[in-house]
Amino acid sequence: KGDVKVVADGICAGINSGELTCLLGANGVGKSTLLRTLSAFQPKLGGNIFIEGKEIGDYTDKQLSRVISVVLTEKCDIRNMSVVELIGLGRSPYTGFWGTLSKEDKTVVDKSIALVGIPHLAHRMVHTLSDGERQKVMIAKALAQETPVIYLDEPTAFLDFPSKVEMMQLLHQLSRQTDKTIFLSTHDLELALQI
């Protein structure tokens, strides 16, 4: 915001499918900025970002929505929508203009709900969920998007410690079970060491 401050230079890194990778750093050091850059939400200052062998800038927005899904830190105040409807929005890169879910889309949504372990929440209204339940719903939405890469910005920010550990274990399990690349940021060293 204003002056450009270089916090790192000459970084070369790769993350494989089926891996959960944690970006660890104190609050305010640029973790969220890096995630926004990696997901093309904001322009990069320099260098190259490749996903599946293709420069991120060479993807159209629609193509990128089939490659990267993002779960942000901000709590969404969603009213008048059920859990299954919200998770169904993860299918938007594959649906037509009206967003009508096909039988296959509904199957993907149901599978995502099962993977995250929230079938009992499927017909609840989103605004009635606890923070931990809501975060699981957002992860299920990212899974329903069927991208090879999932970015999560401080996914445990509003959770108590036992829920944080449960969330990290879930993400670790999902990375292996789905063979997705899961990349998350956190400032919590103790939590990062749990994985």
Task: Put a short name on every predicted segment.
Residues 24-26:
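The feature captures the beta-strand-to-loop junction immediately N-terminal to the Walker
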Residues 39:
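Helix-to-loop junction immediately C-terminal to a conserved catalytic motif
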Residues 150-154:
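Catalytic Walker B motif of ABC-type/P-loop ATPase nucleotide-binding domains
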